[in-house]
Amino acid sequence: MKQENSDPIQVIIADDHVLFRAGVKTALSSKKDVKFIAEADNGMHLLTLLKAVVPDVILLDIEMPIMTGINVLPEIKKLYPSVKIIMLTMLNDHSMVTQLMELGANSYLTKDSDSEVIYEAIKTCVEQEYFFNDITNKALLTNLKEKHNVVPQHLAAAEVVLNEKETTILRLMCEEKSTKEIADIVD
């Protein structure tokens, strides 16, 4: 959480597309509680910048030359664990979302996200650690289901062998006999 509510959230944007960086900065320029303090065009450049200035939030592109966002993410989290990282991409790939969250990302947004969504993600990551949207929710739930679709051995249904009496009771139940009728037939 921010120490002072009056201090703007300091943001670095790392993306190899100059126009995208400029567009995000322009779209959020009216937000007085967000201040862009630097920008980088690749992961290596970003690591160099971080030696001089550490932001509250990094908007990090996944696909960049020299060092990708995927490669630089764990390095940033190791060196600067308090920095919140919002991954930006054109990809809406569930397995990618899960991988990035496991590497330490605090949110995942597609580049076609509205500027208000980006703003909300920045604020929420600072205030609450993570920002989840439909993309992240679906991806994480899908991955969780896939990981837990395997039934543990001790819970797996074992082959059940019924004795003659149990088989008769089951057959009578299927024939919709009453409990009294079943009891009379079995005894």
Where do the protein language model's features map onto the residues?
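Receiver (REC) domain active-site loop signature in two-component systems and cognate sites
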Residues: 64
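Short, flexible helix-to-coil linker/hinge segments that flank and couple to helix-turn-helix
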Residues: 96-101, 107, 112-160, 168
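Active-site beta3 strand of CheY-like receiver
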Residues: 53-59
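Active-site residues of response regulator receiver
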Residues: 15, 61, 89
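Acidic catalytic/metal-coordinating carboxylates
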Residues: 42-45, 68-71
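Conserved acidic segment of CheY-like receiver
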Residues: 7-20, 24-28, 58, 162
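Helix-turn-helix DNA-binding segment
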Residues: 152-187
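Short hydrophobic/Thr-rich beta-strand motif most characteristic of the beta2 strand and flanking loop
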Residues: 33-41, 49
